[in-house]
Regions:
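RNase H-like nuclease fold core
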Residues: 86, 90-95, 103-107, 142, ...
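Short, conserved DNA-binding cores of transcription-related domains
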Residues: 1-106
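DNA-recognition alpha helix
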Residues: 130-141
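Acidic/histidine-rich catalytic cores and adjacent linkers
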Residues: 3, 258, 291-412
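Conserved beta-strand -> loop -> alpha-helix junction used to position metal-binding or nucleic-acid-contacting
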Residues: 240-247, 252-288
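Short, amphipathic alpha-helical "recognition" segments used to contact nucleic acids or chromatin
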Residues: 113-126
Length: 412
């Protein structure tokens, strides 16, 4: 293959490099690495000095153009990790401590740190490693491999596992429990795994993800393990637990938190009820069920359920039977005022969170390991929960109502 013809600019650059190598007495690869380190230090220091000039509005010793009561205040030394080894950089300071350099941020310890943060951010938004490679190449002109991306994202695992084990509050007003399912490669096979999620609302009305656990397909036994884990991390009481109607779930909650009231999700019950209803009946049947769950109180709801049974028993006997069998945990919300009812009668809070997780993970049909699934969910969770800054709607009223219903369990 013929050698590519260089441009005049490239030839000029090469001549300067040759001149630099000769004047620097380069005799080994180690000498070249030292030269690279000096070049990085010079580039950083020149850029930082220019940034401070811009911040203060005047150059060094240019006192005639000084129009500020702030001034330079020497330098601090910072060790920067690079692929060629550690580099000492003299970072200029200002007297007021207001200078926030952008080229080398205050907490930055590596020249690759900014790119690593970008990779983690893209991974958290569900981009594939291939997409991330292309994006980094387009923006920075840097090639990163699948292995490099995995190595960078793996750095988050110890942080994620520490988060999973952090201490929790002693009392939660409401905890929503649900699971979402993914395919993971295990011992040469693709298996279905459940991600168990607990989302809590504390007594200040703040929402928080208490944990996410990758386990075998959803079971009451595993939920018992999850609930015991919450207890071991400091949770002493949960006023109300909102769940789907998984067999054995109520017993699992009762075994760990015996005082907790259980509210089965009405939306899950409606989905199960409508599963085998013919298209021509669905609208009318769902309207009749609405008379049950939207009733003003429990006696009115039971009357509506009786009316539903009379009308639909012959055609769909399993529906009214299911509502009656699960009534104890479906009807919990009727004892509370409307504000509390709205909060607990569905698992919308956790389902909304799950929807956002699925949006991030939809590009992955199969995860190579449990850890790869967990780190993506953790990064996505951090990204999603950044917006969870406020309290739940009507929280002052809800708290006052819970203080009446759970007077003996409400902390002072």
């Amino acid at each position: 293959m013929p050698r590519r013809k260089r441009s005049p600019e490239e030839n000029e650059r090469r001549a300067k490099i040759r001149e630099l190598l000769l004047s620097s007495n380069i005799s080994s690869m180690e000498d070249i690495q030292d030269l690279f380190k000096e070049t990085i230090a010079e580039f950083m220091e020149s850029g930082l000095e220019a940034e401070l000039d811009d911040e203060l509005g005047y150059g060094r010793y240019d006192y005639r153009n000084k129009d500020t009561d702030n001034s330079r205040n020497g330098h601090s030394s910072k060790t920067l990790r690079t692929s060629y080894g550690d580099v000492e950089v003299a970072v200029p300071r200002d007297r007021k401590g207001e200078f926030e350099p952008q080229l080398l941020k205050k907490n930055q310890t590596s020249v690759s740190q900014d790119i690593e943060e970008k990779i983690l951010s893209m991974y958290a938004k569900g981009m594939t490693t291939g997409d991330i490679e292309t994006h980094i190449q387009d923006i920075y002109g840097i090639e990163v491999s699948d292995t490099t991306i995995s190595r960078i994202t793996d750095k988050i695992l110890p942080i994620a596992k520490e988060w999973q084990q952090r201490p929790l509050e002693a009392v939660y007003a409401v905890v929503f429990l649900d699971a979402i399912h993914y395919h993971v490669r295990s011992e040469g096979q693709i298996v279905k795994k459940a991600v168990y999620i607990a989302l809590g609302i504390n007594l200040d009305g703040k929402k928080d993800v208490l944990g996410m656990w990758v386990g075998e397909n959803e079971s009451a036994k595993y939920w018992t393990t999850v609930l015991n884990g919450l207890k071991n991390r400091g949770v002493e009481d949960i006023f109300i637990a909102c769940t789907d109607n998984l067999t054995g779930f109520s017993a699992a909650i009762g075994a760990v938190f015996p005082k907790t009231e259980i509210q089965n999700c009405i939306i899950h019950q409606l989905r199960n009820s409508s599963k085998y209803v013919s298209y021509k009946d669905i609208k009318e049947l769902m309207a009749d069920l609405r008379s049950v769950y939207a009733a003003v109180d429990e006696p009115a709801a039971l009357d509506a359920l009786d009316a539903f049974s009379t009308k639909w028993e012959t055609k769909y006997p399993k529906i009214s039977r299911s509502w009656r069998e699960n009534w104890a945990n479906l009807s919990t919300y009727f004892k509370y005022p409307q504000e509390v009812r709205r909060l607990i009668y569905t698992t919308n809070s956790i389902e909304g969170f799950n929807r956002q997780l699925r949006k991030v993970t939809k590009t992955r049909s199969v995860f190579p390991t449990d850890d790869s699934l967990f780190k993506m969910l953790y990064l996505a969770m951090v990204d999603i929960t950044k917006k969870w800054t406020g309290r739940q709607r009507d929280w002052s009223m809800i708290h006052a109502q819970l203080s009446i219903y759970f007077a003996d369990r409400m902390p002072e």
